[in-house]
Amino acid sequence: MNKKKILVIDDEEDFGFLMKSFFKTRNFDVYIAFTLADGMRILKEEKPDVIFLDNNLPDGLGWGETEYILVNYPTSQLNLISALNIPKTSTSSFRILEKPLRWEELNEMFDSGSLPQKRVS
């Protein structure tokens, strides 16, 4: 079995590197993109198991890609993140996380099994 892949698409470099450090210690392969274009390129190349997608990116609105991701990568777990204007939704297709993220929240996701642990080849 291979490591699970996580893609973080967020223009805040510090946040991206913190997320990478957090998940690498839990044995994930972590990819970071600071623009929507780079994120979509990595998404197509790596087909990650888990995606953390910010909304306000320098080259567009990340959440505008939600439908595309859900349709074309149905096995990827999508987590939308933002510090602004968090909509209330009842969909089970993705999770919405509000910045600043709490490490306890990520630990709970990991410990509860809501983040996949290993990739099945």
What are the residue ranges of the model-derived segments?
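The feature encodes the CheY-like receiver
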Residues: 58
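Active-site residues of response regulator receiver
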Residues: 54
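Two-component/phosphorelay signaling modules centered on CheY-like receiver
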Residues: 13-31
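Acidic, metal-coordinating helix/loop segments flanking the phosphotransfer/catalytic sites
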Residues: 32-50
